[in-house]
């Protein structure tokens, strides 16, 4: 999307010598996991940059899924529907975010292999929290602090279970499970 408010033109801002979107496109191409690397955008300049780095941009994203409130799911569904209407059979879909410059091809390949081996319906990238969340602190309305899990006040960090959060690099799914994305997040 070309209309980011927080960081204008973020998808094509230069990061370490090239547009930030280039890193995701190059990683996708180098992973050898995809028959096609497609960029969905509403912006002509982003489209040109994406093509320059080897992606296809076969359509312009409709305005109704190109605003500040557009979620990822309808964007992916639109791309899949468009591809299928062109006669393509889509079994698996990966949404690699344009602003994921640190994603590497091996991470994509390994995730895809695990996705297939486990016969999963959905996958996404995760990273561990740098500090045990069991020792997280909350601040109430009067400014007082307390632990979310007071029972871990004296626990050694190395004794606590490692926890993870969405790394924001990619999601992958079987194409007809797109509408269930958020249900999967809630089932973990």
Predicted feature descriptions by range:
Residues 13-14, 38-39, 95:
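Conserved SAM-binding loop
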Residues 20-36, 48:
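A short, N-terminal amphipathic alpha-helix
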Residues 1-8:
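N-terminal nucleotide-binding beta1-loop-alpha1 segment
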Residues 45-94, 102-106, 110:
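Short phosphate-binding loop-to-helix
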Residues 74, 78, 101-187:
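Conserved core of the sugar-phosphate nucleotidyltransferase
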Residues 33, 53-55, 141:
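Short, structured coil segments at secondary-structure junctions
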Residues 22, 37-41, 125:
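Short internal beta-strands
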Residues 34, 88-90, 119-120:
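Short, high-confidence coil segments that cap the C-terminus of an alpha-helix
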């Amino acid at each position: 999307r070309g209309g980011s408010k927080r960081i204008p033109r973020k998808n094509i801002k230069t990061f370490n010598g090239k547009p930030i979107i280039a890193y995701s496109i190059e990683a996708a191409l180098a992973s050898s996991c995809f028959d096609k690397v497609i960029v969905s955008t509403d912006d002509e300049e982003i489209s040109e940059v994406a093509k320059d780095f080897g992606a296809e941009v076969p359509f312009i994203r409709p305005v109704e899924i190109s605003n500040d409130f557009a979620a990822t799911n309808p964007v992916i569904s639109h791309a899949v529907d468009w591809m299928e209407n062109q006669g393509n059979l889509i079994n698996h879909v990966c949404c690699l975010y344009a602003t994921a410059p640190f994603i590497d091809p091996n991470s994509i390949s390994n995730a895809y292999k695990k996705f297939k081996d486990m016969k999963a319906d959905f996958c996404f990238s995760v990273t561990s929290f740098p500090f045990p969340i069991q020792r997280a602190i909350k601040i109430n309305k009067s400014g007082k602090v307390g632990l979310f899990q007071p029972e871990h006040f004296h626990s050694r960090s190395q004794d606590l279970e490692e926890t993870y959060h969405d790394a924001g690099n990619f999601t992958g799914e079987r194409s007809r499970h797109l509408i269930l994305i958020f249900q999967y997040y809630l089932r973990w």
